[in-house]
UniProtKB/Swiss-Prot annotation:
ATP binds at A22, G23, A24, G25, S26, G27, K28, T29, R278. It comes from Salmonella typhimurium (strain LT2 / SGSC1412 / ATCC 700720). GO terms for molecular function: 3'-5' DNA helicase activity; ATP binding; ATP hydrolysis activity; single-stranded DNA binding. This is ATP-dependent DNA helicase Rep. Belongs to the helicase family. UvrD subfamily. Residues 1-280 form the UvrD-like helicase ATP-binding domain.
Amino acid sequence: MRLNPGQQHAVEFVTGPCLVLAGAGSGKTRVITNKIAHLIRGCGYQARHIAAVTFTNKAAREMKERVGQTLGRKEARGLMISTFHTLGLDIIKREYAALGMKSNFSLFDDTDQVALLKELTEGLIEDDKVLLQQLISTISNWKNDLKTPAQAAAGAKGERDRIFAHCYGLYDAHMKACNVLDFDDLILLPTLLLQRNDEVRERWQNKIRYLLVDEYQDTNTSQYELVKLLVGQRARFTVVGDDDQSIYSWRGARPQNLVLLSQDFPALQVIKLEQNYRSSGRILKAANILIANNPHVFEKRLFSELGYGAELKVLSANNEEHEAERVTGELIAHHFVNKTQYKDYAILYRGNHQSRVFEKFLMQNRIPYKISGGTSFFSRPEIKDLLAYLRVLTNPDDDSAFLRIVNTPKREIGPATLQKLGEWAMTRNKSLFTASFDMGLSQKLTGRGYDSLTRFTHWLGEIQRLAEREPVAAVRDLIHGIDYESWLYETSPSPKAAEMRMKNVNQLFSWMTEMLEGNELDEPMTLTQVVTRFTLRDMMERGESEEELDQVQLMTLHASKGLEFPYVYMVGMEEGFLPHQSSIDEDNIEEERRLAYVGITRAQKELTFTLCKERRQYGELVRPEPSRFLLELPQDDLIWEQERKVVSAEERMQKGQSHLANLKAMMAAKRAKS
């Protein structure tokens, strides 16, 4: 498939800063991969001097695969394609000395972070989960805005901010003492380092001679600053983004970064991609008219050559049960008549709580479905156990990981033993693992607890020494040495569950072996690099799944971004749901409108909206108004279902069950014939 004129221009412009305004479904990934190929084949760039960054591992993997197909593995070798956080991690790994760190640092995930802050803030904030979550979000926002604990304290307004800034200081000091980083540090530390250290900045500007950034509208303050520091005065970069799809302000994303580009880089070339290869003309007309109600710095209007398409439907339901029943009935009928697959359908909603009633009706009617946001492979307990072992091997200062493994499997090392070990370690300013080797510890600890502890840590020390020479053998010995398979069979609810968990362990070992040994495209990694990469993948892949089964897709509008489906149901189109009540209260309607725009532009062929006349909220019955966004759409292209005679819940249930029973009978008859 040839590039269109806009795509071709975006690929070939390489002489200065470039912003590609890529509308939904306009083929931006093709532009990025073709531009990388053009830089290497047409402009003389070496692959190792080009970096492309995006926001998810899935997007980075897809880009890597496409570039590999276009260029071939040999030509693409050395090319840096990663997420922002992986790029930050690479900078930290190479520049740890300049940051005043040890090379064997660990990464904290959100579970570690919650546990540590809970411990550090005892007596400072009440035992309040909501307040703790607010503290975590505030620390994250401070880091994203490049604020150190001292700067946070200096700018604190009010008592709560002062307490939070103090907690941030305690947290930061503890992280440094344990040689541990959290997710936000992976952007904060490289950015501060490049700001302050001319030599390091120059080294990275020479290393990355052309930078490409995907989903630019999702960047926050620190990410934008990192981009500016990496490109420097040379300003050889391409950023691809869409201000109309900026829906992550609650995560610190700043769509105004697109506007700042033209101020910070006056020579910026703006190229628009407006041809959509996904949706019908009618769907795009609705999206264009809706989003035109938001103010724009860069105007663009999507168009399609895929035909005008089916009218958009609006279904009205009496309440949320009726809404789910109607969507399920419509979906079954459509699936039967059009001989489609279940994975062609998506049900999109504003909040996760809306999915439950849809699950109920899909389940009752034996419709296979999948809710996005399932358990990441790296979040599974067996994987976290093994990664905790490896974290201690590669960073003996990681107390959080040590406490996870010390009794996994059970070793008769009780709380009293661990408390005394903790007191001993604290007075000597050592980690728990390191302190366990102290000669004088035998005076503090005695009996079975001491014997079990020293037996365990000395064995782990042997594995640690083996890991320095033969990491693959060390990991194999570790899994066998703790007899982890027996432990899984003892603690799993069934032998089948234990078998599946052991299969996951073997999968992890297989991936680890590949990464330690390297391949045509990737250099061999050290064990430390492998462990930090896996921990980062866990944090970034929550809810991502590679498996594609024939299932109806249920997901939030936020989770749907970047995806496409032939048939889309946008449910709960009511004031208070979309737009969300908190956004109405905070006058943040523009972002909610962008969210509706994202939902509409997921649909390829048909789009159906649903709304309820009544809903139960917080135990009360409310009568919501139709969403203003429905009223902003071109009414000539909408079919609002005619009002029907009001029937009782019992009559409706009988009628609905009869309708579904007829459809199921038709499907059964069809299966019997085939």
